[in-house]
Amino acid sequence: MKTEKFDRRTFIRTAGAAALAAAGGLSLGKSHADAYRVPISSGSAAPKLKAPANACDCHMHFYDDRFPVAASATLRPPNATVEDYRLLQKRIGTSRTVIVTPSTYGTDNRPSLEAAAILGPSARVVAVVDDTVTDAELKRLATLGVRGIRFNLVQKGATSLDMVEPLAKRVHDLGWHVQIHMLGDQIVQIADLLLRLPAPIVFDHLGRVPQPMGVDHPSYGVILGLVDKGRAWVKVSGAYHDTKVGPPDYADTSAVGRAFVKAAPERMVWGSDWPHPTVKEIASKPDDAILFNLLTGWAPDESTLRRVLVDNPATLYGFE
């Protein structure tokens, strides 16, 4: 009887451990490292940096082949789902999300809005619209969690430069911002236009400041000037886009990120840029843990880190 009792208890303990492991993304016989493996991302280790509660990933995209690709699309990545993304959240420790409609879908924001509905109150959306959008549609988008519009003039498609100022005036009344994805040289060329915009500006991916000039490039000064005037924010994201050095330190683009955060920590937000759509080969995708760890050098103290990951996103996107 004693043996039977011991065996039953052992079975219960083992079954319970297996259930807990499965709930946490582990299985018996599966390595701890594999628990952090994320689709469309390289590496499998957890980041060294511990994310504070309510940390926000302010730049990512969803892809879903149930929705039509825009005729003008130059990027056509594979599916990247909410289920996939939740594995990334588990890996890096973020809980809030800003979904950016990618150029792949033109002005079709349905993939982003559907994902936001699944993620719930922890998600916001930056939409893509053109000059045919109605005021009623803008108001509808606001009720669905949209807090800004994006102009991607790197992967050109649904929007164009002549739409920026008129649409900025319209969305300003909704309390939205205008997100700009342009190369550094483009930003310098339209500096006067940017100064005229009534809505706040959010610059994608470190402002795409070119390397190897980095902070010596005129675009850095243009962006920082707008930040200093309280007119702009910067996403310290996408360190892999313009690097000439590469991982793990991304020393050249990291210098830009560090400079931006030091100059104006109250106007910086961070984003993963998952699933890294400009990197077409799955095997070449960046390691998201390494990208997240860069913040240890850019925001080296706990107060600054909390600003970048929690407080600033709450202000910019309206998280409570």
Language-model segments: what does each one mean?
Residues 56-60, 97-100, 125-127, 149-151, ...:
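Hydrophobic faces of well-ordered beta-strands that scaffold small-molecule active sites
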Residues 71-119:
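Alpha-helical scaffold segments that flank or form the walls of functional sites
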Residues 81-85, 108, 133-136, 187-188, ...:
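Alpha-helical scaffolding within the catalytic cores
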Residues 54-68:
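Di-metal (Zn2+ and/or Mg2+/Mn2+) metal-binding site signature of metallo-dependent hydrolases
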Residues 158-270, 278:
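Catalytic pocket-lining loop regions of alpha/beta-barrel enzymes
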Residues 35-39, 104-195, 235-247:
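Active-site gating/metal-coordination segments in enzymes
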Residues 59, 112, 171, 234, ...:
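Conserved, mostly hydrophobic/aromatic
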Residues 2-32, 36-54, 79-96, 265-266, ...:
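Mid-to-C-terminal alpha-helical segments outside catalytic/metal-binding sites
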